[in-house]
Amino acid sequence: MGDRDLDSQTMIPVQPGSLVIRMDGAFDIDSVQVIRERIEALPVETEVYVDLSRVREFHDRAVALLAEVLAVARARVFVRGLRQHQYRMLRYLGVLPSALDPGLARPALER
């Protein structure tokens, strides 16, 4: 997304095969598109942590689209930083609790 503010998202390699996508500001449809594009460009075996803890405003439609992204993602994707409403929405839309990761660290043996 060419007009997306670059300060609103950051990609941080955590370890080989693992990446954090950190979003801030408003979580809107453009934000989901950024996440979708990043995830689609990664190898299948990559673990992706989407960190929404710095988001000030969540758009419900964007949260619903995020559920769709999580459903079709080839990479393993975990989301953190959700507020209760967004967590409940994602659960209602079929996202497993194991994908709604409360932290960024995941032991290698836990699969």
Predicted regions mapped to residue ranges:
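STAS-like cytosolic regulatory interaction modules
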Residues: 1-111
